[in-house]
Amino acid sequence: LIGSSFGAAVSVYTAGVDERVSAAISSGGWGDGERKFRGQHIGDEAWPAFTKMMDRGRKHREDTGEPLMVPRYEIVPIPEHLRRNLAPGSVMMFPADTAISMYEFKADNVVGQISPRPLLLLHSSEDSVTPTEQSVEMFKRAGQPTDLHLVADVDHFMFGEGNPRIITILKDWLEKYFPV
């Protein structure tokens, strides 16, 4: 099971709770929503604005029964130079409930249950979207066999960059655990 970013967090969580998953690959994933968001909404204004948005979302849902819609970049800030990696027509407004559920999401709590099945953690060494420490922490909590690769010269959307090093890491790992 493979995922990137939020999909990577979901792939790790799913592998941790479902033994039918034979292996997991996480690219730029995260294990603790609150810690991830604290690393993304840095500064005296950004973190309070983010937590107020979640509070407004909860109140709006309670008062109206409807979700409060917020711009995607208020949930996960993506630098301008990486926004071209989003597919044309991508959804740009999300319910505040999305931020709340991500904030509460903790793949860290189940990553250790993946073992003895293999886990591959890939992360940019200087990820401008998801803090690199998220994959490092999952590695610390994981059992074996787990491989962690922190890769220079790529950013958050490493599979979209066509970097041959990423392809080689992935190919070699798959050949090791799933020889043909």
Which stretches of residues belong to each language-model region?
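Active-site nucleophile elbow and catalytic-triad environment of alpha/beta-hydrolase enzymes
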Residues: G39-Q40, F94-V111
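Conserved alpha/beta-hydrolase catalytic His-Asp/Glu region
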Residues: D63-V91
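Short beta-strand/loop motif that positions the catalytic acidic residue
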Residues: I114-S115, L120-H123, D127
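Conserved alpha/beta-hydrolase "acid-adjacent" motif
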Residues: S128-Q134
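Primarily recognizes the serine-hydrolase "nucleophile elbow" in alpha/beta-hydrolase
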Residues: L1-T64, M93-F94, E126
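Catalytic histidine-centered segment of alpha/beta-hydrolase-like enzymes
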Residues: V154-I167
